[in-house]
Regions:
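ATP-dependent carboxylate-amine ligase catalytic core
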Residues: 75, 81, 90-182, 186-228
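ATP-dependent carboxylate activation and anion-phosphoryl transfer catalytic cores
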Residues: 1-79
Length: 229
């Protein structure tokens, strides 16, 4: 089944079969495939004309996402994420997994795998373009104070939050942090890194270039951890 799904580039498919005993391998005989569906329906299982309902959607979700950690994509959120920092993150995660699909929302718009895609006037639409794309496997999202006032965040959870001299509204991004999430707070010329209110490090910097190098050095060891959850 996995080989067939891979061939058609689908995540889930349905196979209708006739079998003497569905518990036995198809190689034992008395087994025939009637139809393969790339977009299987589930309503007939939830509300069958005869017999009891079977939670097929639940079984499908459990097969793809065995624990809650697997049910979401890694997200880095921040109020002032630059193109240079995004490029550095992209390059690093491609070192970890060369096939991962990367999406980011920066001041100039939406990028997929480091290529500019589009900038919608609506922050809501830009975030939706990224999170509704079935290819997105890692997202970096920039939320400014005006975006937050007008639209909110439009997603639940963040593995890393980067607050760079944040305004009051932008500081509410702290509420997005997952239980083991990392908070990076930049104030004046100081970078403080915390996890669960415990300060992990505090570093000084002297210019923008140094700042982004230090941020990246903080993020790098975490990327493999959150990608491989």
């Amino acid at each position: 089944v996995e080989s067939i799904a891979l061939f058609f580039r689908v995540k889930c498919l349905g196979i209708d079969v006739l079998a003497g005993d569905i518990a036995k391998p198809w190689t034992d005989g008395n087994f025939g495939i009637i139809e393969i569906n790339a977009g299987p329906g589930v309503f007939m299982h939830l509300a069958p004309a005869i017999g009891s309902a079977i939670d097929v959607p639940g079984l499908i979700m459990a097969s793809h996402f065995k624990t809650p950690e697997y049910s979401r994509i890694p997200i880095i959120a921040g109020n002032n994420i630059s193109k240079n920092l995004s490029d550095a993150i992209f390059n690093k995660i491609r070192e970890i997994n060369k096939d991962i699909s990367y999406a980011c929302l920066l001041e100039d718009g939406v990028h997929f795998n480091n290529d500019f895609f589009n900038k919608n006037d609506s922050h809501y639409q830009n975030v939706k373009i990224i999170l509704r794309n079935p290819e997105t496997e890692f997202a970096v999202l920039r939320h400014s104070k005006n975006d937050i006032y007008d639209f909110g965040f439009l997603h639940e959870g963040a593995d890393i939050v980067i607050l760079d001299n944040a305004e009051f509204a932008e500081e509410s991004m702290k509420n997005l942090l997952l239980e083991n999430g990392i908070l990076i707070v930049i104030s004046d010329h100081q970078i403080e890194v915390t996890r669960k209110d415990e300060v992990l490090s505090s570093i000084s910097f002297y210019n923008e270039e140094d700042k982004e190098i230090l941020i990246m050095s903080t993020i790098e060891p975490l990327l493999k951890e959150i990608i491989n959850l």
